[in-house]
Amino acid sequence: MAKDIKFSENARRSLLKGVDKLADTVKTTIGPKGRNVVLEQSYGNPDITNDGVTIAKSIELKDRYENMGAKLVAEAAQKTNDIAGDGTTTATVLTQAIAREGMKNVTAGANPVGIRRGIEKATKAAVDELHKISHKVESKDQIANVAAVSSASKEIGALIADAMEKVGHDGVITIEDSRGINTELSVVEGMQFDRGYLSQYMVTDNDKMEADLDNPYILITDKKISNIQDILPLLQEIVQQGKSLLIIADDITGEALPTLVLNKIRGTFNVVAVKAPGFGDRRKAQLQDIAALTGGTVITEDLGLELKDTKIDQLGQARRITVTKDSTTIVGGAGSKEAIDERVDTIRKQIEDSTSDFDKKKLQERLAKLTGGVAVIHVGAATETELKERRYRIEDALNSTRAAVDEGYVAGGGTALVNVEKAVREVKGETTDEQTGINIVLRALSAPVRQIAENAGKDGSVILDKLEHQENEIGYNAATDKWENMVDAGIIDPTKVTRTALQNAASIAALLLTTEAVVAEIPEPKQAAPQGGAGAPMGM
């Protein structure tokens, strides 16, 4: 296919137009008074959301050059979401601010490479200062505050704090749709291990790239499955029952994996395959843990069992299983309390007898998985549209809370980014262009505060001017229209979210500034369909 190429100023201007179109859409959602965005769906009702990454991913622009600019900003949002789980709107606002200022200076004749170096220096100084002013998460109230700010709901904040209290900061918390209108929390038997699906064609939710199995059977084995004939009688029985299947095996190779994938795509039955967790003897022990939890039997030569002889009653079961590319979460295993308790007692005795700190640590991890359970947040709402929007907010809040536990928290509402300006001002560029890059980041740091104020109906410049004359952590609370200590008021952001948003924004914006050519495909004209000739007159 033929290509069209734009150079220098023309290329950057086209990219910036795309940046602006996406950012102007996303930034209306930032802050407690942020608006919602309605997204058209290819089928069904439209989505109403204020989730930055969801909006960014849904935008496709007609102009190919503008679309490339939009996709670069969406990448900053997506990377921030992948690392920190939230902060996508902040990343978008910062990317636009740095890119806009940078483009002005490059157009005026500044060297983009020098500007990029300045941006990188300023970003490092800002990130270092963020870590210095960060607070550790030490109480349930602080967890609730982080979640409440992210979701704009004290009710959701309290729910997530309760969930973390019940299963621990490192515990497994999942989100499910409720059949009622209330959002509730429950703790069920379950565990999570760090193995994901063997093929992306096994996913059932393409937006989240997850595979969800309801009331599935679970085949647990330490063997390799390479010949589909070994498990064919078992598969046929499962298909007849209309059930889904999770296969946990040493590996699935040869014709077995493509055969399973083909049957999944054709809709014969819902199947997901994952590799068994752990290695060596630890792998066998972990498989026994999963078997105890789900009421299954490990198909292993150690017990004289063969795959071809496996019966349905040797399979485990669970209420729900969610598999991502990196992990598998089992919720509501069908194992008996007696079997689980017996397994727990065995592990506790092994911990007492172990003389190796490393072995003890691994045994304690297994014990925690068997005894900790899984916290399930059942999301309720009156309508399907409201349910989706509420679920997005709870997912963001949960991710924010985990980020705060990892790296602590800073004053929210964009206040922390303005507070680090002093540290950035102390950074001096070696050249005029480097200094220009530093100044660009300095101006961009105030962009989130400006936008939060404007979304609340205030003049962003007036709010910013007043904020820059306040002590650290004193900021503008857009929710109450008051000036107060943001940390004391519970308006806090995870340090990891703020840091990641700034780093990704600076990285993508710097790439935009140093772009000298953009290559796009020229769409081939659609050939007109041949017109049919006039038919012969019908005889009488």
Curated annotation (Swiss-Prot):
<comment type="function">
    <text>Together with its co-chaperonin GroES, plays an essential role in assisting protein folding. The GroEL-GroES system forms a nano-cage that allows encapsulation of the non-native substrate proteins and provides a physical environment optimized to promote and accelerate protein folding.</text>
</comment>
<dbReference type="InterPro" id="IPR027409">
    <property type="entry name" value="GroEL-like_apical_dom_sf"/>
</dbReference>
<comment type="subunit">
    <text>Forms a cylinder of 14 subunits composed of two heptameric rings stacked back-to-back. Interacts with the co-chaperonin GroES.</text>
</comment>
<feature type="binding site">
    <location>
        <position position="493"/>
    </location>
    <ligand>
        <name>ATP</name>
    </ligand>
</feature>
<dbReference type="GO" id="GO:0005524">
    <property type="term" value="F:ATP binding"/>
</dbReference>
<keyword id="KW-0413">Isomerase</keyword>
<dbReference type="GO" id="GO:0005737">
    <property type="term" value="C:cytoplasm"/>
</dbReference>
<feature type="binding site">
    <location>
        <position position="413"/>
    </location>
    <ligand>
        <name>ATP</name>
    </ligand>
</feature>
<dbReference type="GO" id="GO:0051082">
    <property type="term" value="F:unfolded protein binding"/>
</dbReference>
<dbReference type="GO" id="GO:0032757">
    <property type="term" value="P:positive regulation of interleukin-8 production"/>
</dbReference>
<dbReference type="InterPro" id="IPR018370">
    <property type="entry name" value="Chaperonin_Cpn60_CS"/>
</dbReference>
<dbReference type="InterPro" id="IPR002423">
    <property type="entry name" value="Cpn60/GroEL/TCP-1"/>
</dbReference>
<dbReference type="Pfam" id="PF00118">
    <property type="entry name" value="Cpn60_TCP1"/>
</dbReference>
<dbReference type="GO" id="GO:0016853">
    <property type="term" value="F:isomerase activity"/>
</dbReference>
<dbReference type="InterPro" id="IPR027413">
    <property type="entry name" value="GROEL-like_equatorial_sf"/>
</dbReference>
<keyword id="KW-0963">Cytoplasm</keyword>
<dbReference type="GO" id="GO:0042026">
    <property type="term" value="P:protein refolding"/>
</dbReference>
<dbReference type="InterPro" id="IPR027410">
    <property type="entry name" value="TCP-1-like_intermed_sf"/>
</dbReference>
<keyword id="KW-0547">Nucleotide-binding</keyword>
<feature type="binding site">
    <location>
        <begin position="29"/>
        <end position="32"/>
    </location>
    <ligand>
        <name>ATP</name>
    </ligand>
</feature>
<keyword id="KW-0143">Chaperone</keyword>
<dbReference type="GO" id="GO:0140662">
    <property type="term" value="F:ATP-dependent protein folding chaperone"/>
</dbReference>
<feature type="binding site">
    <location>
        <begin position="477"/>
        <end position="479"/>
    </location>
    <ligand>
        <name>ATP</name>
    </ligand>
</feature>
<comment type="similarity">
    <text>Belongs to the chaperonin (HSP60) family.</text>
</comment>
<dbReference type="InterPro" id="IPR001844">
    <property type="entry name" value="Cpn60/GroEL"/>
</dbReference>
<keyword id="KW-0067">ATP-binding</keyword>
<protein>
    <recommendedName>
        <fullName>Chaperonin GroEL</fullName>
        <ecNumber>5.6.1.7</ecNumber>
    </recommendedName>
</protein>
<feature type="binding site">
    <location>
        <begin position="86"/>
        <end position="90"/>
    </location>
    <ligand>
        <name>ATP</name>
    </ligand>
</feature>
